[in-house]
């Protein structure tokens, strides 16, 4: 060979050359395919990251401005749960979707690391076009949870999505297709996933309580949801309807604490508002029922609140406070636990502390109800802030003109009397006696519930000064 030839390997057989050329082509093609696959995978990852940020499957909302919020954002992650839409074919299932929403709010309230707005304030947006920015600014929260419920026979589909109102972005979403009997597990998982998305660590007992089943009887739960709606409205007809429904819950599942707690709470309210025909017997029943609820499930906060109501109806304000303290331990961010703690404390002779709890309840539920205004009015009266008492009860009569609760009308008249405004007191007394002709101080059981004699006497004398009769008219 005149010139040297570079060779990697000498092939001695004629067929080897063709074989090696084909093999080399295959190896090259394989490498090219691998590179292409790697490049395609990289593009998918980049696209995925971009999509996760852009979220084209969600409609981004206009961000809320913390400076325009009605309340300063709390130190904890704050959240409002909007009423879940009822997408069931049967529109009568509205109570069920409302119940799912309420239970998710309750479960979230069990998590001490969250600030959760109460049902009373979020349900004012029910049936309205949702404006996340408006909700966040009016309620003073950073996060909003919304979703839907579809129920078909023994199946449910629940969707939920969590929005950061300050950015307008969605930070978590999920769809659950489950058996109806698994509704409690779904509700608990929504609460847990929300906490996880907000980087809130659950305490061991909080995680355990989230996944407790209140009842395995879905029919009992169904009736309980209907019965619970009667608690919100304070009319006599509504309360009497609630009594029947809670009794039905107990029949369907004697091991469900909710039926006993609800019926106990209902009877205590009847006694307190003087709707009861047998107050002494109803107080005893309320006690027994609440105690059964607590024995069945010590972690059911409403059972302790109901027990507090029974204590108060029996004139034991200290017992009422002790009972609700247990509810607060179970639901530290619970609106009702703080509300009733405030209500019972002023009966126990601690109106200043009562006002603090009621202010927290107000922050948890910025949209006021008759109950919110009434409880704060009583606390301010016992705190000797009569001007604020009058303002609250005047505001209540303006917002809720059909609410003519005798005790509250008497409280307003008494406050006017202590402010030396006899003409205005007389106007309120006339309205009181027009609505409740038999009302008199000697039979005013509610006026006897205060622990301190000084408070009972102050209220009684002020009501008498306002012109409320001491004894039934004509006697």
Mark where each language-model region is:
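Terminal, low-structured helical/coil segments at or just beyond the last alpha-helical repeat
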Residues: 441-475
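Short, Lys/Arg-rich N-terminal segment immediately upstream of the first membrane anchor
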Residues: 24-31
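Cytosolic regulatory/linker segments at or just downstream of nucleotide-handling modules
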Residues: 1-23
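TPR/TPR-like (Sel1-like) alpha-helical repeat modules
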Residues: 417-439
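Short, flexible loop/turn segments with low-complexity composition
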Residues: 22, 206-211, 472-475
């Amino acid at each position: 060979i005149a010139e040297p030839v570079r060779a990697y390997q000498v092939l001695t057989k004629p067929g080897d050359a063709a074989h090696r050329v084909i093999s080399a082509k295959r190896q090259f093609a394989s490498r090219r395919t691998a590179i292409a696959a790697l490049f395609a995978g990289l593009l998918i990852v980049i696209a995925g990251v971009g999509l996760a940020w852009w979220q084209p499957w969600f409609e981004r909302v206009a961000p809320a401005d913390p400076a325009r919020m009605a309340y300063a954002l709390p130190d904890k992650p704050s959240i409002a749960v909007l009423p879940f839409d009822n997408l069931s074919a049967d529109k009568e299932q509205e109570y069920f979707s409302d119940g799912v929403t309420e239970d998710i709010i309750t479960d979230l309230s069990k998590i001490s690391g969250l600030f959760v707005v109460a049902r009373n304030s979020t349900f004012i947006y029910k049936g309205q076009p949702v404006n996340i920015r408006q909700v966040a600014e009016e309620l003073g929260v950073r996060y909003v949870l919304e979703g839907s419920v579809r129920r078909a026979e023994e199946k449910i589909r629940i969707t939920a999505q969590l929005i950061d109102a300050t950015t307008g972005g969605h930070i978590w979403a999920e769809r659950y297709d489950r058996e109806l009997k698994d509704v409690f597990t779904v509700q608990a998982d929504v609460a847990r996933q929300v906490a996880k998305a907000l980087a809130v660590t659950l305490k061991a007992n909080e995680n355990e309580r989230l996944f407790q089943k209140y009842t395995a009887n879905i029919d009992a739960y169904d009736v309980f949801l209907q019965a619970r709606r009667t608690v919100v409205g304070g009319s006599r007809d509504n309360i009497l309807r609630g009594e029947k429904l809670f009794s039905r819950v107990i029949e369907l599942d004697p091991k469900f604490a909710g039926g006993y707690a609800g019926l106990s709470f209902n009877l205590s309210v009847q006694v307190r508002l003087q709707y009861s025909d047998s107050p002494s017997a109803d107080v005893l029943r309320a006690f027994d029922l609440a105690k059964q609820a607590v024995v069945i499930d010590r972690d059911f906060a409403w059972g302790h609140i109901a027990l507090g109501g029974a204590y108060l109806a029996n004139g034991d304000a200290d017992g009422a406070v002790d009972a609700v303290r247990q509810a607060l331990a179970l639901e530290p961010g619970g609106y009702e636990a703080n509300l009733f703690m405030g209500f019972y404390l002023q009966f126990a002779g601690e109106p200043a502390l009562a006002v603090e709890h009621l202010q927290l309840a107000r922050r948890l539920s910025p949209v006021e109800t008759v109950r919110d205004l009434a409880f704060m009015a009583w606390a301010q009266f016992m705190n000797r802030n009569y001007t604020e008492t009058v303002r609250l009860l005047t505001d209540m009569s303006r917002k809720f003109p059909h609410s003519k609760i005798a005790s509250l009308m008497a409280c307003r008249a008494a406050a006017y009397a202590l402010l030396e405004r006899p003409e205005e007191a007389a106007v309120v007394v006339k309205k009181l006696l027009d609505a409740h002709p038999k009302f008199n101080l000697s039979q005013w059981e509610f006026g006897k519930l205060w622990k301190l004699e000084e408070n009972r006497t102050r209220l009684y004398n002020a009501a008498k000064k306002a012109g409320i009769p001491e004894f039934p008219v004509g006697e």
